[in-house]
């Protein structure tokens, strides 16, 4: 496995369980992320994507949203040296324009300083899978208008499909090339699709997370709240994945 994605759910319930304010749960969740990143590196996993803040989360109270943004800013400032030292590349996906200019600047600076890291931490922030697909479709369509149709002659040549193009269409229906081009328009361009998606807290849904990229991902659901996600639970998720036969839409021979 090279890419693990996590829906970090249960911070609020963890805080309530321990009679603490919700932001205390988010701080505990940040500590759990630190540990999980370390375990991923130990396991040889190259990419960790975490669902930190969705486009729907803006509907939460102003106090909680402000606290979450402050927590993220603190994470960026306090973890910079550690991420660089440990070879961790930091990357954010989502609607950056929704964030404050200050936070956008901090994110861009950390991405630049960690760009050579061999392990990649992807943080989904003000992110929604449907929104990402819509934005990608607009880019895809704009680029399509500026490039000739594949397999058709241009600039006065005969307007008939080439033999090679016709063969491609017969074998693949053009979907392989189209999918690759469309994928390059997504926020996750250059990042492999997740092999395993883990969701904590007992919820059995993906909540608008990586909808395009999750097409062939395996899923692991656990009742454990995110701040309580420990090495034992991490190992269970990895072990569950290792026992599965991934067909990727085809049949095993």
What are these regions (language model features)?
Residues 1-150, 163, 168, 173-253:
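Flexible, compositionally biased loop and terminal segments
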């Amino acid at each position: 496995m090279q890419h693990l994605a996590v829906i970090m759910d249960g911070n609020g319930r963890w805080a309530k369980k321990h009679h603490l304010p919700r932001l205390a749960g988010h701080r505990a969740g940040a500590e759990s992320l630190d540990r999980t990143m370390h375990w991923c590196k130990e396991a040889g996993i190259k990419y960790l994507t975490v669902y930190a803040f969705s486009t729907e989360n803006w509907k939460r109270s102003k106090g909680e949203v402000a606290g979450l943004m402050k927590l993220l800013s603190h994470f960026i400032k306090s973890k910079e040296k550690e991420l660089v030292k440990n070879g961790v590349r930091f990357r954010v996906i989502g609607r950056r324009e929704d964030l404050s200019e200050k936070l956008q600047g901090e994110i861009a600076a950390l991405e630049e300083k960690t760009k050579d890291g061999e392990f990649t931490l992807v943080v989904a922030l003000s992110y929604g899978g449907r929104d990402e697909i819509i934005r990608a479709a607009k880019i895809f369509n704009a680029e399509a208008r500026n490039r000739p149709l594949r397999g058709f002659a241009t600039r006065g040549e005969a307007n008939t499909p080439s033999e090679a193009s016709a063969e491609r269409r017969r074998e693949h229906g053009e979907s392989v090339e189209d999918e690759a081009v469309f994928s390059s328009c997504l926020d996750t361009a250059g990042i492999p699709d997740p092999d395993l998606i883990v969701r904590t807290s007992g919820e059995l849904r993906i909540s608008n997370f990586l909808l395009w990229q999750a097409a062939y991902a395996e899923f692991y659901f656990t009742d454990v709240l995110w701040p309580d996600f420990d090495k034992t639970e991490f190992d269970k998720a990895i072990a569950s994945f290792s026992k599965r036969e991934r067909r990727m839409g085809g049949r095993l021979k």
